[in-house]
């Protein structure tokens, strides 16, 4: 049986204690230490020989160590000290960039693999949606993953579910115990597959769509009519569909259709 710490590069153990505490506090970073989980994540990415891979926040390099054997790897690490050690270990096999992924201009990529920092999972995810890539296998905090993949009618279905659905098809792959990390988080994690695709609807105005989604899910227990009135004060909603329903029951396509009708009224 493989030990969770087997394969861990001992150079990372020399990190000053204050550095580790600072990184955890600033980035919400919990390092994966289970080699079996790391291998499972990479295998599920189904990487082909000629594909270009992006890893975000490689940390101590447990995924990096496997990914460099799979294809052309670009790893982006924000933490200066970790980036230095990663470059020492992987510079001949991968391109290691010290940068904040939220500011980094992502080149053409086929596959994304990452254990994302819990505290900034959402901004990173929507940053990725601005770029072209085929698929991703990402690890999130379990609660975030549940909201990401949620379907209409479920308690976790909301703004995140609808907006992510505009860009990708999501699927839960497997749960990861909190014991697979160092430091150990308070809750479990979930690995999710994302496949890029176009939505099954056409939007007349994306900004209006964002506004509608935000409006109807901010007060999710209110009727849609009452939610929209708070943000679209000059629009009469009586002739629109779904006004007496709650947002949690609408399909993304139905929300898009509602958004298009509101945009048409605004444009008159």
Model-identified regions with their sequence ranges:
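Low-complexity, intrinsically disordered or signal/transmembrane-proximal segments
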Residues: 6, 18-19
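Catalytic cores of RNA-modifying enzymes
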Residues: 21-215, 253-264
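C-terminal lobe and adjacent flexible extensions of AdoMet/dcAdoMet transferase-like proteins
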Residues: 215-268
């Amino acid at each position: 049986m493989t030990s969770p710490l087997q394969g861990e590069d001992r150079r990372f153990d020399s990190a000053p204690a204050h550095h580790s505490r600072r990184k955890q506090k600033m980035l919400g970073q919990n390092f994966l230490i289970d080699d079996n989980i790391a291998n499972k994540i990479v295998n599920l990415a189904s990487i082909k020989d000629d594909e270009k891979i992006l890893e975000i926040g490689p940390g101590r390099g447990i995924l990096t160590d496997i990914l460099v054997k799979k294809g052309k790897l670009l790893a982006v690490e924000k933490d200066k000290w970790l980036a230095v050690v990663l470059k020492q270990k992987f510079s001949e096999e991968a391109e290691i960039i010290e940068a904040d992924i939220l500011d980094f201009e992502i080149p053409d990529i086929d596959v994304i693999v990452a254990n994302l920092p819990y505290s900034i999972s959402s901004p990173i995810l929507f940053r990725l949606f601005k770029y072209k890539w085929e698929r991703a296998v990402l690890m999130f905090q379990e609660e975030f993953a549940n909201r990401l993949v949620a379907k209409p009618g479920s308690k976790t279905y909301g703004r995140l579910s609808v907006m992510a659905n505009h860009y990708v098809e999501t699927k839960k792959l497997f749960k990861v115990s909190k014991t697979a990390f160092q430091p150990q988080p308070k809750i479990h994690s979930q690995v999710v597959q994302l496949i890029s695709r176009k939505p099954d609807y056409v939007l007349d105005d994306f900004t209006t769509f964002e506004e509608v989604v935000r409006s109807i899910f901010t007060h999710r227990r209110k009727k849609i009519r009452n939610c929209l009135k708070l943000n679209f004060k000059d629009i009469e909603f009586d002739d629109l569909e779904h006004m007496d329903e709650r947002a949690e029951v609408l399909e993304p396509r139905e929300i898009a259709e509602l958004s298009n009708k509101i945009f048409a009224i605004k444009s008159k």
